[in-house]
Structure formats: C-alpha cells, structure tokens
Amino acid sequence: MAGAAPACADPAPVIQAMRAHDWARAQALAAAFPDPIAQKLVTFARLLTPDTASAADIGAFLAANPAWPDQAALRHRLADAITNDPDQATSLADCQAFKPNLDEALLRCADAERLAGHAETARALAQRAWIEGVRDAQDEAAFLTDWPDAATPDVQWRRFDALDWARDPAAARQVARLDPARHAEAVARQAFQNRDPAALDDVADIPQAQRADPTLLLDQARWLRATGADAAALALWRGAAAAAETHAPPDRRPAFWTERDRLARAILATGDNEGAYFLADDPNVAPDQAPDALFLAGWIALRRLHDTPRALIKFQSLQAMSHSLITQGRAWYWLGRALAGEPAHQAMLHAAAYPTTYYGQLAIAQLSGAASIAAAIESAVGPAVPPAQAKAFAGTEMIRAATLLIGWGDPHWARQFLLRQAQLATDAARFALVASNAASLGLPDVSVQTARLAGRQGIVLPRLGWPAPFDPPATPGVAPALVLGLMRQESSFDPESVSPAGAIGLMQMMPATARQVAGQGGQDLKNPDLNMRLGIAYFSGLLRQFGGTLPYAIAAYNAGPHRARTWIAENGDASTLAPDVMIDWIERIPFAETRNYVQRVLENTAIYAAHGAK
C-alpha cells in the first residue's frame, strides 16, 4: 500500500547524535556528506537547542537565513541567550543589536541599560515587559520591588487590559493595583467574562466616559448572548457596541466579527431577519473576516429577506475582494442565484470554472447535471513548470535539506522545510514545485497543505493537491472517495497527526471513540490500516444514525452527533427536501469550522470520485 514517509525506527547516526546533543559527533558525521547542507543542518539544530549558542551566533544565522523554517523558535532561543548571558557588556550589545521581545529578555535588557546609565530606556523596556509578560505571582512581586516606578497607572491598566484580553488568570490579580478610576471597569469586565449574573450591576459603577470602551462592550455583548438575552444583545449592537467597534484596536476586530456572527445566527432562528442582517453587515470587519461577513449578509438578504439588490451588492463585493478559489466559486454561484436570465447563466458559468470547490461543483450540476462534475474536475489543469525551473528548485537549500532529512529518517523535520517554502511561495510554478517535491519525498500532507495555500491565491493544483496515498478498505455504503475526502480534511494524510484535542491519525480518531468502536483500548491509532478501519466503522454508524444523509453524517463526524441532531431540530430536516434547502441548511451550521468542514469533504469526495476512487 502506498503511503506517507514513515518515521524511521532507526534514524541515521547523525540524527541520533543531534538528538543526544552530541554536536561534535554530529558535525563529524555530517562532514562525511558531500553536500555542505548536512553540516548546516547540524548547526541549525544546535542553534534551536537551549543553552548551546550565543545570541550573536543565533542572530547571525537568522539574518543570513530568513527563508529557513522555525524563525520564531530561533528568535525565542536568541532571547533566551540574552536573558541567560551574565556578561553585562555582551548583553547590552545584544539587546541593542537584536531588540528581543520576550519579557524575560526585555527585563535583562532593562537591567543592562540601567547599569549603563540609560535610565529612560531601561524604564521603557521594563514597562514593556510588565505589560506583555511577567505572569507568575512571585515574579510580579519581584518586578514591583525592582522597578517601583515602572508600573504607572497607565502602564498598570495596559497590563490588566492585555492579560484580561488573553483570558489570563493573572488579570484578576491586577485589579487591586489599578487606579481607582479604572477599578470599576475592570471589575465589570471580569464579571462579564465569568458569566456573573449580576455583572450588569457593576456597569452602574463605571464612569460614563469609560462605558464606551470597545472591549468592555464586547464583553457585555458576549455575556448577554451567553445568558440567553439575544434581544438585549442585539439592542446593544444597534447602539453602543457597534459605535465602539469603530474604535477597537485592529488586532481585536476579528473578535468583534466572531461575536456578531454568532449572534446573527442565533437571531436568525428567532425569525428576526433584519436584525440578523444588521449584525452581518459589519462595516468595521477585519480584512480576514470580510469574506465571511459579506457572504452572510448577502445570504440573509437573498434567502431570508428576499432583497435581491442588497444581496447583489454583497456578492459582487465578495467576488471582487478575493482571489481565493473557494471564495470565487461561492461568490459567482450566489450571484447566479440572485440574478435572472442570461446574467444568471453567465455567473453560473464563472462559478463552474472552479470545479475543485463546493460551489463550483454545485454550479456545474445546475448547468449541465451532476454527471458532468467529474469531467469538469478532470479537465482542470495545474501550473506548467519549465524543466529548467524545476531543476533549479531541486538545487535550493530547502529542497536539498528536506531530501537529506528524509534519507536520515526524519520526515517530521523535512516537512518543516517544505512547508516553509509553501508559505513563502508567491507564484503558481513555485507552489507546484513544492507540492511535487513533497509528493516525491513521501509527504502527501505537505502537498495538501501547499494546495490549500495556493488556493487562497487563486491557484489550483488539481492532482498534486488531492493525493491518494492510502487505500481505504472496502466498506459497504462508504465509498473510498468519501473516506479519502474525510482523511484529506482531517489529517491531510499525515498518519502521525495529533490534534490539540487529542484526535489521532489519518481519520483523527479520539481514543475514547476508538475504544467504543473497537470494544477495547490500547489501539495504535497511528497505524494507518487500523485508523482507517475504526474511522470508517464510526462514520458508517453515523450514516446509519442520520438515515444516509451525507451532510448530516459529515457534520456529526466533525462536531459530534448530538450537535448535528440539535441543528436538525433547530433548522429543520432538509434531507427529503429540494437540494437548495440542504445548501441553506449547511450554511446555517453555527460553527464556522463545521460549515467549512462539510463543504470541503463534499468537494473532496467529488474530486476523488473523478480521479477514479469510486
């Protein structure tokens, strides 16, 4: 069976030496390889290891190798080196040269500047460290003893604000240190976050001028929705909250949209379509969230308000603002739904030009029938790469490093080099080269992730982006194309994948679910065959639970069967109604992750079926 590059049980001696931190032996072993990249990899690994290099060495490597992976980790090591260097003169020089951001390094730099007689610079650095870090209670006490004049009222408020925004428990300790004029606002924010039923009473103690604070109003809006007061939350958004959003810091704007989106979907269930439209029509939405806001507003206008002019404005804006394949397919499809006659037909033709997307496939089905989807997918052509460019790319440091690491039995590390190249790619040929090299090195997950990044720039990798490195076992009622589509979305075909929640392997099985399906524990869920067998068995059971309705089963696989049943109860059962109703049902899933998941798995399934995995 084909598959991904396995993690070698007996990695090369040079890898073993690096893992043992035997750097002299590792360099000697690397020197035996004709490619100098071998020795550079050892240097790189050493620089990434705590307490093995000076700040100057790490800084020099960073400056000379901006395209190498793990840039953030290197900067962290650089900050650690500055923090731990006992020499004042060296620390001062490194602080001034590299300007670290981590709070421990900031404090070390503050000390060095203070000893050098640079009092104002030292104080400013200490204040940055206090605002951005120093989370431990003992460290707080030490800081306040060492820098008694640094925690000014303004600085102390900024510290509370940063910790509170990050939902750090240390925020609660800061309230007593605040200027009395800001105390009531901080108490109210904490009360809203803690779902205190009496939180609104705290607002009465806040000076009027502070009640328009954007974060305070966002916390209040969240509290109202979470406590079931949707109408009051909408009223707040129609008044103070929407006005405050215009003054929110740019890095907090995404949170405002997330809350508006959640409330809009809850308000839809009550039948207040105008209220839901108001929430979706967010004039201050952050750029990354703008496509979602435009689409939701357009969808509500068309499907709930039956207001075609407003819907067209939103869908046209959506189409114009992004090159993403998914966004283009979605925008053109819904323009086709909103328009009539020949303009509608032309819009659907535009949507059908994106056959690897969910809405592109729906457009093809509407234009010429579902049977035409496979041919359209097969006709999609990826970027052409001149042989000379392919040869040159294979000779770059990143590809040489990845190739060497695969040979050394460390596919995990090789993956980082290829993913970094995908992140830096800006043209179609380079995306294709990263994906093809990943495929040849046995890293299909990198090919998939590269295709996703390319898709955001309007570039399709029709074959490279949908590999089939594993053969799903034959299972009645569960087509191989569907299993491949699930695995692509779940793990990108990385059998070693472990999610933050603890889901494991190709089909991201939770150990408890695997025990339930298998009737026993102790299973090696990183084993591809076992993972597929258990995952397919679980999905097959979901299909039976939901009467064979694929979108319901897919939603249940992602979010759990209880949530899927809740959504059916709230939004109606679309399984026996016209296809348009199911399209709307999917769009009404309240979790953005699950909405996206269902659409991606459906489009993946069609692609794999077109590729022959029936």
Language-model-detected regions and their locations in the chain:
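Solenoid-like repeat scaffolds
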Residues: 27-37, 47-51, 59-70, 81-83, ...
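Residue-level detector of the short coil/turn that links helix A to helix B
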Residues: 21, 86, 117, 167, ...
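TPR repeat positional signature
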Residues: 10, 38-39, 43, 75-78, ...
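Single-residue signature of alpha-solenoid repeat helices
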Residues: 26, 91, 122, 172, ...
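Structural register within alpha-helical repeat arrays
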Residues: 13, 41-46, 78, 109, ...
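N-terminal leader/linker segments that initiate helical-solenoid repeat arrays
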Residues: 5-45, 376-398, 407
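Residue at a conserved register position within TPR or TPR-like alpha-solenoid repeats
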Residues: 17, 82, 113, 163, ...
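Catalytic glycan-binding domains that act on GlcNAc-containing polysaccharides
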Residues: 36-37, 44-45, 59-60, 64, ...
